[in-house]
Structure formats: structure tokens, C-alpha cells
């Protein structure tokens, strides 16, 4: 339950405990007195712009520190801080030893998920709210996927329910299927947001249980979804995805009701 006191401060009550919530939105600095951008932040932004402009990909090397100092007109300390900022976000990693240096990382939704959990926690969001976000986002991705020109070829391998025997096979199939839907959606923002939300559910909620009894139904639902997407039926695809998620969410609510009322953990 969320409450507001006379001073306008927001608090959330979960499992009988009330705690204050940091309001995420307009801050005290939004009155026209924003702090100046730090040199390291400016350098980090320039590095990202150059990374995109030059078409660098995962595993490509960035210039060495000395070259960056000259290129970005910054001190060594500012360049190092900029690289640390990017490393924390998973956008680069620093390879040690000879031939090392900054290397382009992966655009991994797990990094967005991790950062998002901090803001979700501060805003008082529960895991139930994360489920509802997924229920809103993923059917839209399915509808968009059903309009993609490459949908038939991409969905071909999912048209028949997979015969999977092990947990690892099942998880790989599930990640592959939903990942293909996200890619076919053709909207990188929708794709990243949906993948981040789904990653939080997988790592924070599903990890506490193993719904083996749902696997057969889920695999048949994937096949039905694949046929709707491949057949260019966006409304059907959206409806089937909504039903697919609703069945899983109902299972989580029955089997882990306390977990869903908890604040999203930052991790």
C-alpha cells in the first residue's frame, strides 16, 4: 500500500513494514540550477558517440588511454573515470596485460535490468508491478513481430512444439523463442525494455521456483504464437501472448504470493 503524509512524502507498506520511498522524477536540481556535467561524464558520452559513429562492435578495441587524453582533451584521471563509468554499465570492459585496454562490451539487457532494479526499488515498485509491466509490453512485441517481413523464416523452427527433456534445453528454447519475438518487433527500445523486465522476473521470481508442470503447455503456446506471427496475424499474436503470460503470472501468484508483494531488490 502506498501512502502520502502531510509533507508530501511517499511511503510504501509491504508485509506489514512501512518504509519511505524516494520520489523518482523532478528533483531539486530541476529548477534551472542543474549541476554542470563533469568532464568524465562528457568524455564518456563522447566515447559512446564515437563508438556508434565508427561502427565498433563487441570485442573491438577502443583507443588506448594516452590517445583518448589527446582525442578528448581531458586529463588521464578524467579518461579513467569515464572508462569506469562505461564499465559499470557493461558497455566496455578493461582487458589486462599486453594487447589489453578498453574493449567494447555487449548491449546486454541484463545491464539495463540491473540498473532498473535500483530505480524500481527506490520508487517502491513490487514484483507484482514488474509482472504487470511485462503483461503490457510483451503482447505489443508479438503484434509488431507479426508485421515483420522476415517473420516466416525466423519463426520456422518454433512452429511445432519442441520435444525437450532437460531443464537447460527448455531454458535455451524459451530464451531463443522470446528473444526472436523481441528482435522481430523491430523496435530496439521496446525490445530492450521488455527484455530487461523479463530478466528481472526470471532472475528474481522464477529462480525461486521450477514450474516443471507448465512446460508442456508453454511449449504448445510457443508453437501457436509462432504460427500466428509467421502467418502475419498481429491481433491473434498479441492475444495469444497475453494469454501465455497470464497463465504463468497466475502460477506465480498462487505459488509465491509473498514474493510478489516484496519491493524489487537492487541486484
List where the protein language model places each region.
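Short linear motifs at protein or domain termini
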Residues: 1-133, 147, 260
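A broad structural signal for alpha-helix termini and local helix breaks/kinks
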Residues: 72, 185-186, 256
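Conserved amphipathic alpha-helical segments that form helical-bundle/coiled-coil interaction surfaces
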Residues: 130-207, 218-226, 236-251
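…primarily DNA-binding HTH/wHTH and HhH modules…
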Residues: 257-267
